[in-house]
Amino acid sequence: MIGVLGVKTEVKLDIREKLSIIPKRYESSLMKLKEKCDEVVILSTCNRTEVYYSYKKHNENIISHIFKCLNWDENYKKYTFHYKDDEAINHLMRVICGFDSLILGEDQILSQIKQAYEIALSSKSVNRDLNKLFQMAITCGKEFRNKSQLYKIPVSSASIAVNEGRKHGGKNFMVLGYGAVGSLAVKYILSGEFDKLYIVVRNPSVVDLRDDRMTIINFNERGKYYKDVDCIISCTSAPHVVVDAFELPKHKNIVVYDLAVPRDVDEEVRYMKNVKLYDIDNISCINDENCSKREDIMNNNLFVIEKYEREFEKWRKTSEISPHIVNLKKKGDEVYKKRLTTFKNKKYTKDVDALAEIMLKSTSNAYINKAIEVLKEEQLKGRGEECLRIIEKIFYSAQ
């Protein structure tokens, strides 16, 4: 069975924080979950936390096991959803295509799911079912974007934050963190007008961009530069607050966008008269001008999702008989190798053509005689008609 346990997108941020998984705990969490499931993939972004799993043996306590492994309070179960098999598969396909998101059609989710899959792959927490499902989902996401051409009207929490920052008169930006979201925010800032950009990182070597208006500063020195900016975009993976209220200037207007979950910005910042603070929920509520256009385009391309759902279901059904196919091939090898040995031993002592005919006839009889034997047995059991239909399909239609 394949399933997914996730946090509902409409749940308030303070609850989502308690049900989040920070990146540095991914691998240890995967290992704990792997003890209860056959396969596991963790997807944790600023807008969603989801655990995809598979297992062969029935486990009615799977949700409790997941909560326990992740040290989540079971009183929060009501804030989660749980889908199985077809619903879980459909959910992943829709998510990777940008549906079921706080920001419809967001363009970060494909790379985020790909990264989640790669972490699970390197941690050896996926093998057959989830491996194939995520491979197909990633291909589905790429095809969906190509067919819908959503790249022409991109949207993400980073793009909204940068655009809104500019609307508030932002010219001097600071971006804290240079992961997937941070690097995207930097890209959007560099593509438009600005005076100064400060990129705050723990390891300056990760930023390989060059621009005279850009300054890379060490994380520990960030407080010195708050007075020089009018827009802060924070998107680190820290489990604690990184922007404290007491560090911000008291007499300078600043707009702050907190794109992190758990939140990067001290909640006290919200009460500062000279600072406007927007968290990820506030940003997700900003209905950008292209929202309805993206929705129409996406709905017109739902057939892509349906196509990959059918393909995965087809793969699942055929993969169930894979062990039998392997055994059939082994049996075929046994039949021909035994006769090949006989042919090699006798080809110089008998007429080669006659010997070849005998060997080929023997190979054919090995299967025909067994088919006749099974057909007779099934006829006596009242299943002769069904057996004959299969035999006809195998032998009579063979070329």
UniProtKB/Swiss-Prot annotation:
Record remark: domains: Possesses an unusual extended V-shaped dimeric structure with each monomer consisting of three distinct domains arranged along a curved 'spinal' alpha-helix. The N-terminal catalytic domain specifically recognizes the glutamate moiety of the substrate. The second domain is the NADPH-binding domain, and the third C-terminal domain is responsible for dimerization.
Other remarks in the entry: During catalysis, the active site Cys acts as a nucleophile attacking the alpha-carbonyl group of tRNA-bound glutamate with the formation of a thioester intermediate between enzyme and glutamate, and the concomitant release of tRNA(Glu). The thioester intermediate is finally reduced by direct hydride transfer from NADPH, to form the product GSA.
GO MF terms held by the record: glutamyl-tRNA reductase activity; NADP binding
Keyword annotations from UniProtKB, A to Z: NADP, Oxidoreductase, Porphyrin biosynthesis
Active site: C46
Listed InterPro entries: 4pyrrol_synth_GluRdtase, 4pyrrol_synth_GluRdtase_dimer, 4pyrrol_synth_GluRdtase_N, GluRdtase_CS, GluRdtase_N_sf, NAD(P)-bd_dom_sf, Shikm_DH/Glu-tRNA_Rdtase
Residues at which substrate binds: T45, C46, N47, R48, S101, E106, D107, Q108, Q112
EC number: 1.2.1.70
Reactions accelerated catalytically: (S)-4-amino-5-oxopentanoate + tRNA(Glu) + NADP(+) = L-glutamyl-tRNA(Glu) + NADPH + H(+)
Gene: hemA
Binding site for NADP(+): G177, Y178, G179, A180, V181, G182
PROSITE patterns: GLUTR (PS00747)
SUPFAM superfamilies reported in the protein's UniProt record: Glutamyl tRNA-reductase catalytic, N-terminal domain, NAD(P)-binding Rossmann-fold domains
Assembly, per entry: Homodimer.
One GO term of the biological process aspect: protoporphyrinogen IX biosynthetic process from glutamate
Organism: Clostridium tetani (strain Massachusetts / E88)
One Pfam family from the record: GlutR_N
Pathway listed: Porphyrin-containing compound metabolism; protoporphyrin-IX biosynthesis; 5-aminolevulinate from L-glutamyl-tRNA(Glu): step 1/2
Family of this protein: Belongs to the glutamyl-tRNA reductase family.
Annotated function: Catalyzes the NADPH-dependent reduction of glutamyl-tRNA(Glu) to glutamate 1-semialdehyde (GSA).
Protein name: Glutamyl-tRNA reductase
Family annotation (HAMAP family): Glu_tRNA_reductase (MF_00087)
Annotated site location: Important for activity: H91
